[in-house]
Amino acid sequence: MRKIKLIAVVGPTAVGKTALGIELAKTFNGEIISGDSQQVYQKLDIGTAKASKEEQEQAYHHLIDVREVNENYSVYDFVKEAKVAIDTIISKGKIPIIVGGTGLYLQSLFEGYHLGGEVNQETLMAYREKLESLSDEDLFEKLTEQSIVIPQVNRRRAIRALELAKFGNDLQNSESPYDVLLIGLNDDRQVLYDRINRRVDLMIDNGLLDEAKWLYDNYPSVQASRGIGYKELFPYFSKQIPLEEAVDKLKQNTRRFAKRQLTWFRNRMNVEFIMVGEENYQQKIKRKVSDFLSSK
């Protein structure tokens, strides 16, 4: 069976994934699937760095604004809905282009491990999400508790070993139906951090405080409120800290998040990054995509 060709644009926040995804969609007759766990929420546009209405008019976006703010969203939901979006795009004769920085979502979509049946698949992904939330120390402690020995201790092997221990023969390793071209974007660290700081300032100027205050007043305890861009501002609204301190915390958390994203994509998905500061980097990427799409 011939595999479905997918393009995936990944990398840290603020590196330029949205702009590149739109450019590739326009060049190669594609549609975009958002691979971001926060952009699924309606009414949360600024803090999630959602593609603007103008950007969405340039290329159709799937999996944006598909949940109410008070609804939960899981890796299982993403995989199920992304597969539907892929099939829809393919049926139009177009190329699916996945753009996002939520590594667990993308990895779970691309790999072939699964359990038989809908309910079991949801169980597997919920368990994986739980393991991913653990620190390295707690994760490796679970290996020790269950007397699991793996040849090389790293997070990916540890999580796979724990999944096998829990689900045993029910965990099937089927071949992925997708042939994925991973395009990783990165930039000089200080340049990226400066861009993050400027973007936070721009978000504040564009109305992030009003957006976050609405969330704080109406849905302070939902899953969406725990995302970066909102939780840092809640202590300001409750008069615990001044605005300047809250904004500094938001910048700091975003920079740390970018670092974690880079680590994830390097270590878990073996992404080779292209530096956006390189001359003609978009042209190089377009040639790479063209070669990929024309190959059998």
UniProtKB/Swiss-Prot annotation:
Principal EC category: transferase
Single Gene Ontology BP annotation: tRNA modification
Residue sites binding substrate per the record: 13-18
Gene3D superfamilies according to UniProt: P-loop containing nucleotide triphosphate hydrolases
Domain of life, per lineage: Bacteria
Binding-site positions, ATP: 11-18
Entry keyword set: ATP-binding, Magnesium, Nucleotide-binding, Transferase, tRNA processing
Ranges where the record places region Interaction with substrate tRNA: 36-39
Annotated positions for site Interaction with substrate tRNA: 102, 128
Cofactor(s) the protein needs: Mg(2+)
Pfam families the UniProt entry points to: IPPT
Entry EC no(s): 2.5.1.75
A molecular function (GO) term: tRNA dimethylallyltransferase activity
UniProt catalytic activity: adenosine(37) in tRNA + dimethylallyl diphosphate = N(6)-dimethylallyladenosine(37) in tRNA + diphosphate
Family: Belongs to the IPP transferase family.
NCBIfam families per UniProt: miaA
Protein role: Catalyzes the transfer of a dimethylallyl group onto the adenine at position 37 in tRNAs that read codons beginning with uridine, leading to the formation of N6-(dimethylallyl)adenosine (i(6)A).
Subunit architecture: Monomer.
Protein name as it appears in the record: tRNA dimethylallyltransferase
